[in-house]
Amino acid sequence: MSKAHVIGLGKSGVAAARLLKREGWEVELSDGNTSKTLLQQQQELAAEQITVKLGQSLELNGDNLPQLIVVSPGVPWDIPVLIKARQLGIETIGEMELAWRNLRWRSQPQASLPWVGITGTNGKTTTTALIAAIFQAAELDAPACGNIGYAACEVALSWSGRGAGGREQGAGGDREVNSSSSPSLDWVIAEVSSYQIESSSSLAPRIGVWTTFTPDHLSRHKTLENYYNIKAKLLRQSELQVFNGDDAYLSQLGLSAWPNAYWTSVKGKDFLISEKGFYIENGWVVEKLTATSAPEPIVKVSTLRMVGEHNQQNLLMAVATARLAGINRDAIARAIQEFPGVPHRLEHICTWEGIDFINDSKATNYDAAEVGLASVKSPAILIAGGEAKAGDDTGWLAQIQTKAAAVLLIGSAAPAFAQRLQEVGYYSYEIVETMERAVPRSAELAKEYQAPVVLLSPACASFDQYPNFEVRGDRFRELCLAWAAGGKLQHNLMLSSSL
């Protein structure tokens, strides 16, 4: 029996281990951490004949080496053991690559399962969720997976084969027509991070989407050029390509780098980089599929409930993807009208005495936080801070000076952020350190400044105080709802819970 080793006991690692076990591999899984939760998972997987080693790292010694190593997305691709594995000729891949191979090999060549792959520094989760909603409104079985939180290997595990029906051709894509009740997939809608692209050698989507590109994850990828080339790999391996033409970096490369791509622009037809693409004109998303085709209105922009120009960019890319897959206007309009948005991305939590509390915890870098602040009403009370990342904060600071009545700083970045605010002549800030102090203070300041919005948009990672941005956003939501329910009566309880 062939032996496989999976690194990382998160959702992706567990799904990969189970998929390999189902395919007949002897599976071992390791994680350098140990906790009560991990020990429980260890017992559950042991019952499935999957060996789990906690508090240990993979070592490649002796003769009993694995034939395959699968890494979870959070595992750096250049750690010594993986470099050694490749030198020894041990195939080393990521969890998403494993899912891609499994689903592709189970499909017939004449009816291969198409994927949409969405990547980008910011905007990819919202775009992924909106694309999946549109495909599902068109009655396609098209799960969203990957970096969005549902592992691609979980999709592979849940799929037991296609139905007995044939396939229908659509403009730019095809769809399966099921004539049995057997579970089937029509598309896979995958949000793909740079980490996942890096470890996926053969992933080749039918449609690739690139939302934005700004400096991020440079502690892992070292240089901006490396980061760009990793992202570009996914698009180069995609049959059709959709780009955000309003992104400064991507548009600068333009047709010279991507001559056959479909480009988008919220600014109108005159700003479209190529002769084909999708743009906004007179309040409509307009489609122009070829240089000679007439422009066609597809859906009203006002159908989308989410605020901000960046969400109009996300809308354009989602509509472009849907049209290239052959989905009709009615399904697109229906899905967009019903789309509620994505948690932690300008998520409206509650309204208290006329003040909206908005959760933008996913804004983990300066660019995303700048967009978040630009998208809300002013003046706003901003909560920012956490674990700082490298990047250019110029635009973010300018947006604070324009839109923020006051800034409340939390986390380890608070002193550095305070210094940067002073350097640009902005002094309406307070270091409050914790979310428990920030929420009640933000409510007080909003009343004082008559600010219509309290916005959590950290411009930082969460790891100094929280396991991830979701937990940070959930805590903000919990505190906001408690404040709205009890007002100042909750203040002392919040403060005591932070001590």
From Swiss-Prot:
Reactions listed under catalytic activity: UDP-N-acetyl-alpha-D-muramoyl-L-alanine + D-glutamate + ATP = UDP-N-acetyl-alpha-D-muramoyl-L-alanyl-D-glutamate + ADP + phosphate + H(+)
Enzyme superclass (EC): ligase
GO cellular component: cytoplasm
A single BP term in Gene Ontology: cell wall organization
Record Gene3D superfamilies: Mur ligase, C-terminal domain (3.90.190.20), Mur-like, catalytic domain (3.40.1190.10), NAD(P)-binding Rossmann-like Domain (3.40.50.720)
Enzyme Commission code(s) on record: 6.3.2.9
Extent of the signal sequence: none
Subcellular location, record wording: Cytoplasm
Keywords: ATP-binding, Cell cycle, Cell division, Cell shape, Cell wall biogenesis/degradation, Cytoplasm, Ligase, Nucleotide-binding, Peptidoglycan synthesis
Record-listed ATP binding positions: G120, T121, N122, G123, K124, T125, T126
InterPro entries in the record: Mur-like_cat_sf, Mur_ligase_C, Mur_ligase_C_dom_sf, Mur_ligase_cen, MurD
Pathway assignment: Cell wall biogenesis; peptidoglycan biosynthesis
Lineage top rank: taxon: Bacteria
GO molecular function: ATP binding; UDP-N-acetylmuramoylalanine-D-glutamate ligase activity
HAMAP family with a match to the protein in the record: MurD (MF_00639)
Its job: Cell wall formation. Catalyzes the addition of glutamate to the nucleotide precursor UDP-N-acetylmuramoyl-L-alanine (UMA).
Assigned protein family: Belongs to the MurCDEF family.
Name of the protein: UDP-N-acetylmuramoylalanine--D-glutamate ligase
Organism of derivation: Nostoc punctiforme (strain ATCC 29133 / PCC 73102)
Gene: murD
